[in-house]
């Protein structure tokens, strides 16, 4: 096992205009402060305030949005990072691990990774993701890319349809179709940071949000050694070269993860489990007393001084006994949050330290809070109660179905841009309006300037005389539409759908 030296991981260089020379501890910290400013002031972070956490189109400001959730994750991530550093300091291992002058950047990378962890999520959360993928699967039929004979290919796009005698090109077609039909919020986050927003963050900071290490075009089984790390797509074909450079800069083996990403993941797991239940009480899906009974019965066998009694039972008893001028709801969730954090943060920090050789190598093939311990069981308890009593509630399911229809409907509306021939779309991009395509011209004008420029830049660099050109042009055209629609807030997507469908406001 190679030695653990975080100076090889906390890489403060950037893709463009990178700082040069040897830097002092203070200068390195200033570089990461610059990252913080770029992230906090980015439009992608601001848009999180109108994106779904659990309840779409929620008008009650007390219920969490993606932004307030991300801020809570940021705080928990900071807490875990500080706990890890404190324990390593007590063990006199900070210098051994190359962290003695990097404690500030260590904390900052974790905090900002937590704040950014959801920036790629589309409107309406996972149902928005499903709508995008289902729509493009019906359009491109990626499963037919393996069909024999090739005449069974139902793809409606001629440039992506498999052709006899074009095996090399067919491999690219398969890759492109698979990639487009696997939109994923984490992969879109990488695309936002590098390609669309051009934030030019340090390599270490971007490494912190590369949660999954499987490329979106992957076909077939994943290796058992990386099954957890590769359970979802982590980046797209469009960012393949950037990720290859990222791996080199952070000394990451293929399909391995950046060490601090495990902390971000644990902070997210801890935060949303309690928060989803609190929001459900705020929405009157159930009362706090009903919630306690749901948790009690779901835990199963009860023993004195069990983790359930120390965390949930303690919160329930204190909230009932406390005579402070606060509601039982407020007190219960205050105590539940404090008790949960104290137990799970401590456990996550120790798991990080105990498994540091594998984590540093990027090969630890599970989450910090995913094992056979009671702490993992407590987290699963919260998740299971939320699944059974919150996510399955008729009001929540109705809003999710509406969100799915909105995203599917918007893709239907913008489909004419995907139906244009290569030459017609290229002419539309150059002239921005064409009389013979009045609908397509108006749809093109509605696309974000940032997204259009990203498309133009990458396509202009493709060799037009190459056989791959029509395939890759269409790939980036699909990305253009996905970028635009996934970047909408819930409310904007809802309003845009109603406007374009001529539904009365």
From Swiss-Prot:
This protein's record includes keyword Lyase = no
Asked if the keyword Magnesium belongs to this entry, the reply reads yes
Q: Which cofactor does it need?
A: Mg(2+)
- Which keywords belong to this entry? Hydrolase, Magnesium
What SMART domains does the annotation carry? Answer: HDc
Q: Which InterPro entries match?
A: dGTP_triP_hydro_central_sf (IPR023293), dGTPase (IPR006261), dGTPase-like (IPR050135), dNTPase_1 (IPR020779), HD/PDEase_dom (IPR003607), HD_domain (IPR006674)
Q: Which GO terms describe its molecular function?
A: dGTPase activity; magnesium ion binding
Q: Which GO terms describe its biological process?
A: dGTP catabolic process
Q: Which reaction does it catalyse?
A: dGTP + H2O = 2'-deoxyguanosine + triphosphate + H(+)
Matching SUPFAM superfamilies: HD-domain/PDEase-like
Q: Which family does it belong to?
A: Belongs to the dGTPase family. Type 1 subfamily.
Task: Give the matching HAMAP family.
Answer: dGTPase_type1
The protein, known as: Deoxyguanosinetriphosphate triphosphohydrolase
Q: Which organism is it from?
A: Salmonella paratyphi A (strain AKU_12601)
């Amino acid at each position: 096992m190679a030695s653990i030296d975080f100076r090889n991981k906390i890489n403060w260089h950037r893709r463009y205009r990178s700082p040069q020379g040897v830097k002092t501890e203070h200068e390195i910290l200033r570089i990461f402060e610059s990252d913080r400013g770029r992230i906090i002031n980015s439009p992608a972070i601001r848009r999180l305030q109108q994106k779904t956490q659990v309840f779409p189109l929620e008008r009650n400001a007390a219920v969490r949005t993606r932004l307030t959730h991300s801020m809570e994750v940021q705080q928990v991530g900071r807490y875990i990072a500080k706990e890890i550093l404190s324990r390593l300091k007590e063990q006199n291992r900070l210098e051994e691990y190359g962290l003695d002058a990097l404690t500030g950047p260590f904390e900052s990378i974790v905090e900002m990774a937590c704040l950014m962890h959801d920036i790629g999520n589309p409107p309406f959360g996972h149902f928005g993701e499903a709508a995008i993928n289902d729509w493009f699967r019906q359009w491109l039929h990626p499963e037919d890319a393996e069909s024999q004979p090739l005449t069974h290919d139902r793809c409606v796009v001629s440039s992506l349809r498999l052709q006899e005698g074009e095996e090399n090109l067919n491999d690219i077609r398969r890759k492109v179709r698979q990639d487009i039909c696997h939109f994923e919020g984490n992969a879109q986050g990488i695309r936002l940071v590098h390609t669309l927003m051009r934030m030019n963050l340090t390599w270490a900071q971007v490494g912190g949000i590369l949660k999954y290490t499987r490329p979106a075009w992957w076909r077939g089984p994943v290796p058992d050694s990386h099954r957890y790390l590769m359970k979802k797509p982590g980046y797209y074909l469009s960012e393949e070269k950037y990720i290859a450079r990222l791996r080199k800069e952070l000394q990451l083996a293929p399909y391995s993860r950046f060490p601090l990403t495990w902390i971000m993941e644990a902070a997210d797991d801890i935060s949303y489990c309690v928060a989803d239940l609190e929001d459900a009480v705020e929405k009157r899906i159930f009362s706090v007393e009903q919630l306690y009974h749901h948790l009690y019965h779901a835990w199963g066998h009860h023993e004195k001084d069990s983790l359930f009694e120390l965390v949930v039972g303690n919160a329930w008893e204190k909230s009932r006994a406390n005579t402070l001028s606060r509601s039982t709801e407020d007190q219960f969730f205050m105590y539940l949050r404090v008790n949960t954090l104290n137990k799970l943060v401590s456990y996550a920090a120790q798991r990080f330290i105990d498994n540091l050789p594998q984590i540093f190598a990027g090969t630890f093939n599970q989450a910090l809070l995913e094992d056979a311990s009671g702490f993992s069981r407590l987290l699963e308890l919260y998740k299971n109660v939320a699944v059974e009593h919150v996510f399955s509630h008729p009001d929540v399911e109705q809003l999710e179905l509406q969100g799915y229809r909105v995203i599917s409907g918007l893709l239907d509306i913008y489909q004419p841009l995907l139906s244009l021939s290569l030459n017609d779309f290229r002419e539309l991009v150059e002239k921005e309006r064409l009389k013979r395509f009045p609908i397509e011209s108006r749809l093109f004008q509605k696309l974000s300037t940032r997204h259009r420029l990203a498309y133009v830049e990458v396509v202009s660099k493709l060799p037009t005389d190459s056989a791959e050109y029509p395939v890759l042009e269409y790939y980036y055209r699909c990305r253009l539409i996905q970028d635009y629609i996934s970047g909408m807030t819930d409310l904007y997507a809802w309003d845009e759908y109603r406007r374009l469908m001529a539904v009365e406001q």
